[in-house]
Amino acid sequence: MKEQTNWLIVGLGNPGREYEKTRHNAGFRAIDRIAEKLGVKIDKLKFQGLYAQVNTATGKLFLLKPQTYMNLSGRSVLQLSAFFKVPPARIIVLFDDISLEPGKLRLRKDGSAGGHNGIKSIIQELGSQDFPRVKIGVGAKPHPEYDLADWVLSTFSAQEEKFLAPAIDRAADAALCIMEKGIAEASNRYSGKA
């Protein structure tokens, strides 16, 4: 019998209705899309987050939305991954990236936080940066003096939303592809333009 492997897909964002449509919540939107595709609800409250469990042919897949606020996301990720014994290499994180324009995706096998506080928290808590990521472009600040926190907590223009909606869908597919086919194949298929 084939050994069972557990996977965890994490969408980063801030809890609360007022943050729902902000740039910083692109990860939440993408993981909600995965849940839709798999026909599950992310509604179990534990591990300082909301999660869902999906039984697959090869093991269990967990979908997690940390409810800690962005800067402490790693606490939730560590708790769930430790409990269900999911190693960093099988933790896929979906999150917003201001260095990419809306509609673009970038997949990474590992790496530093690149200035993203949610990723920084996960690296800190796991003690590893060896986890795959799907970065969702949310656009750069309009000018250098613009406050970063204000920017990531702002909402998308109607024009940006047109590019973002299909990118959210592709980010969901990309995360599932990493799990099924590996990061190289997923990068070939999904990195770049929507």
Q: Which residues fall in each region the model found?
A:
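Hydrophobic alpha-helical segments within soluble ligand-binding/sensing domains
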Residues: 115-118
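Nucleotide and nucleotide-moiety/phosphate-recognizing core
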Residues: 1-110, 120-135, 141-147, 154, ...
